[in-house]
Swiss-Prot record:
It comes from Pseudomonas aeruginosa (strain ATCC 15692 / DSM 22644 / CIP 104116 / JCM 14847 / LMG 12228 / 1C / PRS 101 / PAO1). Belongs to the UPF0157 (GrpB) family. Gene3D superfamilies: Beta Polymerase, domain 2. This is UPF0157 protein PA4798. Residues 215-242 are annotated as: Disordered. Signal peptide: none annotated. InterPro entries: GrpB/CoaE, NT_sf.
């Protein structure tokens, strides 16, 4: 009898989807500590001067129900080849999605078989113009409990509807994410609003807005187009948005 094959990963789902179920749990005050411990391990493994490491996603918002997965955003300095991040992260137990059709982004997952019993961490690497959206969304939810509550209710409903389909779960959040992010962009007078690239939530269809925000600059992580964003983004990182 042939030995069992390890699960295959397509970026959203493993072939053993029943072992990768979506659960949205009550907020855990230990999540920031889990991030801090993993961030220190990553910083040590990469040994990259100037590296930014940010806690993003729902576990980075105090009091927000979330999937118990720590999302980590890496901000390598301009000029650094992001492919050099792969081997050290794999050494920490991360699996790199090499078949990602979006070549501007890199995605790593930790905790799935045969290395563990379920997702525990995600690591994201992307152009800084895209990273900016993640940080803005996080900081807005930290300071706007009504939007955080709306987001949590949406996630609970989608997790009940799509317990093993992460692609459908993520797609189902599009409209709410777009509305919240549109408010954040407008209220903070974000450069994307000032430049006319984004006209605000009322003038833009939800999917169009989200695709604009998630796509960001058409560049590779660490590429030349990132340079202009780097200092301004790093100066604003982790500052709450009022």
């Amino acid at each position: 009898m042939s030995s069992p094959q390890p699960p295959r990963f397509d970026g959203q789902r493993w072939s053993n989807a029943d072992d990768d179920r979506i659960e949205v749990l009550p907020a855990d005050p230990a999540w920031p500590q889990h991030f801090a411990a993993e961030a220190e391990a990553i910083r040590t493994a990469l040994a990259l001067p100037g590296l930014g490491i940010e806690h993003v996603g729902s576990t980075a918002v105090p009091g927000l129900d979330a999937k118990p997965i720590i999302d980590i955003l890496l901000l390598p300095p301009p000029g650094h080849d992001p492919q050099r991040l792969v081997a050290p992260l794999e050494g920490l137990g991360y699996q790199f999605w090499r078949e990602n059709p979006n070549t501007q982004r890199m995605f790593f997952v930790k905790g799935m078989p045969p290395f563990g019993h379920g997702r525990t961490h995600h690591v994201h690497v992307m152009p800084l113009a895209q990273a900016d959206r993640y940080l803005l969304f996080r900081d807005w939810l930290r300071n706007h409990p009504d939007d955080a509550r709306l987001y949590a209710e949406t996630k609970h409903a989608l997790a009940r509807r799509y317990p093993t389909d992460r692609e459908a779960y993520t797609r189902g959040k599009d409209e709410v994410v777009a509305r919240i992010l549109g408010r954040a962009l407008a209220a903070t007078r974000h450069p994307m609003i000032q430049s006319g690239l984004v006209r605000g939530e009322r003038e833009m269809h939800a999917r169009e807005l989200r695709e604009t925000l998630v796509a960001g600059a058409e560049s590779t992580p660490g590429g030349p187009a990132d340079t202009a964003y780097f200092e301004s983004l790093r100066s604003r990182v982790s500052k709450p948005q009022d």
